[in-house]
Amino acid sequence: MISYQIVEHGKPLQRAVLETPKPEGTEVLMRITRAGVCHSDLHIWDGYFDLGGGRRFYVKERGCIPPFTLGHEPFGVVEALGKKAKGVKVGQKRLIFPWIGCGKCAVCKAGQDNYCVSGSRFLGVNRPGAYSTHVLVPDPKYLVDTTGIDDSFACTLACSAVTVYSAINKLPALGPKDEVAVLGCGGLGLVAISILRAKGMKNIVGCDIDDAKLTAALKQGAKRTVNTLAPDA
């Protein structure tokens, strides 16, 4: 298989020809057809997250040691199955949930693999990701049928969409007449507006410092917008 790897932080990704893994047990080999680029990928490529105030969080502390393959927004086609893999068939298209846990700790057993205390199996972070022709997935439970959604959009859902959906579900009970402010109208903010509308919210206020993004928020369904740099904001 072909992967594009970080060999040195801040330098162009390097093409690598690697052995295509063979799935065993419950494993599923996916042929990647779409891979989103998250802003976190850019931070990992840099080698650190800027925390502000001169502070940095270096990704090597999370096990991101070059060479490794980025990509935690994967979508692909089932290419091969281990003998114990059930529930999917070769040729089916699936979104791949990238936040893979150990499967043994309490949070994994509760179905919350993204909170896994091991933190060492996330695709594109500690495990080879989707900037590759193939990805090995440990279990079919991480594969999601997104029939009816464009593949190029579906690949982002297990990152940006679940982030926003989780935040919205933490809101207190709201009525249809209540206002909800969305702070920041970039990619996640626009997804937030879509989800809020789907949940019946009509009074959505988009807030940003970029007028172009505020225009996009109105097109997405915000009722009004606020430029937070404006004197009357």
Predicted regions, residues:
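Glycine-rich beta-strand-centered segment in the early N-terminal region that forms part
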Residues: 21-35, 50-106, 147-149
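Short Gly/aromatic-enriched secondary-structure transition segments
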Residues: 43-50
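Adenosine-nucleotide cofactor-binding segment
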Residues: 179-185, 197-233
